[in-house]
A protein has these predicted regions:
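N-terminal export signals
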Residues: 14-33
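Residue-level marker of intrinsically disordered, low-complexity segments enriched
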Residues: 4-5, 13-14, 133, 388
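Histidine/cysteine-enriched polar flanking segments
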Residues: 31-442
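N-terminal secretory signal peptides
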Residues: 1-10, 24-25
């Protein structure tokens, strides 16, 4: 399907977004364009709201994960897929059909910038008439420019050369999707990804201060909060200092020889609303914290977050209930730094990805820690989909404890587990690889 198509069109439940020109957008009804007024009572939707559909991405390196996600979600919610082009759609169809799923029941959307971790590119809301809309945040490719400047200061290539690879076209994907689906768009001056937006749907936003600051380097906290309070439905912000230590910003050092690959602190790794006043918080096994340096840092950080949340209230002044959810046992593997490394792969690293001041050399061995957390769960109507870490060394009794917590806070929902480890090695997970479209009124 040609990238230069003047208007989006449907074919076998397929919609093409790439190439939606300004002239074409002008032909859309006024309520479908960016800046359209939202009905009174608009709000960013909460993850625990009823779900109209779950969107998935496609990437050849994650085919098995996509198949597992689609198979688990299929009985509970309609599936839609955001893929780069017709070729990717064909491959995705084959993956679904290989699991016995009817790909003709899936709505495919094409966009040349479609990411695999679709959660981060688009944020949905519901207006007062319960019609979905899109919140258009600025896109920084997970703070890539700042990471480049920090990492390559004093090195070649220069920071500016690295930063030119931002792929900022992804930042307009949410607007293109909103326009093509006939949805209004609310534009924000803030930069963030969907995995860093945690709301209760009733006025409260939980923000990781370190994360939001890394994406909005030219804004102080007061300025950011003013913009947050302009977001649809947001009346109060709770600031938490930091996220999980092993969710580093891109590839980076955690402590000593321990390194990670992550987002720099997405809230969907460590703090999630179960309902409007119940907050799930990642927690560390204290025995593990006593013996493992990464677990020790995580315990310190989560204790600080717990203290803040326990003393906080929702937007209406009601106290929050904070429930500690055990983290899986720390998952790690040794990696030898090599100048010949193909860094497209999660298990290949080079000394060049670290700041010069750290003094790392090719041939050094580092210990990569996976970005693992049960809180990177997916809610899909009557289903709770959790990561499965027993095969990665987490004691079965700990995972059963996690299951019991989820069954208690999500009564009436089935709790199922899925292997997410390959996504965890690159800073993602099941929640990152899914995008929740809230149920509105048809």
């Amino acid at each position: 399907m040609p990238k230069s198509a003047a208007m989006p069109f449907f074919h076998r439940h397929t919609l093409v977004l790439a190439g939606l020109t300004g002239a074409a957008a002008a032909l859309l009804p006024s309520w479908a364009r960016s800046g359209a007024a939202l009905a009174r009572g608009a709000r960013i939707s909460a993850d625990f709201d009823p779900v109209a559909a779950i969107w998935l991405g496609y990437d050849a390196g994650h085919e098995a994960f996509t198949a597992d996600l689609a198979t688990a979600l299929w009985p509970h919610v309609p599936i839609r897929m955001l893929v780069r082009d017709a070729e990717a759609e064909g491959l995705a169809r084959a993956v679904l059909q290989g699991r016995g799923l009817d790909a003709d029941k899936v709505r495919f959307v094409h966009d040349a910038r479609a990411p695999f971790f679709v959660r981060d590119a688009v944020v949905f809301g519901l207006d007062g008439a319960r019609q979905p809309f899109v919140v258009d945040f600025r896109w920084t490719y997970y703070g890539w420019t700042n990471w480049c400047r920090r990492t390559f200061r004093g090195k070649q290539p220069r920071p500016e050369s690295c930063a030119r690879a931002d792929g900022l076209d992804t930042g307009s994907l949410d607007r293109r999707l909103g326009d093509a689906l006939g949805l209004a768009t609310f534009q924000s001056a803030l930069a963030i990804e969907g995995g860093g937006v945690e709301v209760n749907g009733q006025g409260l936003l939980i923000a990781n201060a370190e994360l939001w600051s890394s994406r909005n380097r030219n804004m102080g906290r007061a300025a950011m909060e003013r913009e947050m309070l302009r977001l649809p439905g947001i009346r109060k912000v709770i600031w938490l200092p930091r996220g999980l230590a092993h969710d580093t910003l891109h590839r980076g050092t955690i402590t000593g020889a321990y390194v990670g690959w992550g987002t720099g602190g997405h809230t969907d790794e460590f703090v999630r609303f179960a309902d409007a006043r119940t907050v799930l918080l990642a927690w560390v096994d204290e025995a593990e914290a006593a013996s493992h340096p990464v677990a020790r840092i995580n315990l310190q950080r989560m204790q600080a977050n717990f203290d803040i949340l326990s003393a906080s209230s929702d937007a209406d002044g009601q106290p929050l209930r904070v429930i500690k959810v055990p983290l899986p046992r720390t998952i790690e593997r040794p990696v030898v730094l090599s100048a010949d490394a193909d860094t497209a792969y999660s298990n290949q690293w080079t000394a060049a990805v670290f700041p010069a001041r750290e003094g790392r050399r090719e041939g050094d061995t580092v210990i990569q820690v996976a970005t693992s957390s049960y809180l990177n769960h997916v809610l899909a109507n009557d289903l709770v989909l959790l990561p499965d870490y027993v095969g990665q060394g987490t004691p079965p009794e700990r995972q059963q404890q996690v299951k019991a917590i989820y069954e208690a806070v999500f009564p009436g929902r089935k709790v199922r587990f899925i292997d997410t480890i390959n996504a965890n090695w690159v800073g993602g997970g099941a929640h990152c690889a899914t995008l929740t479209e809230p149920a509105g009124i048809p």
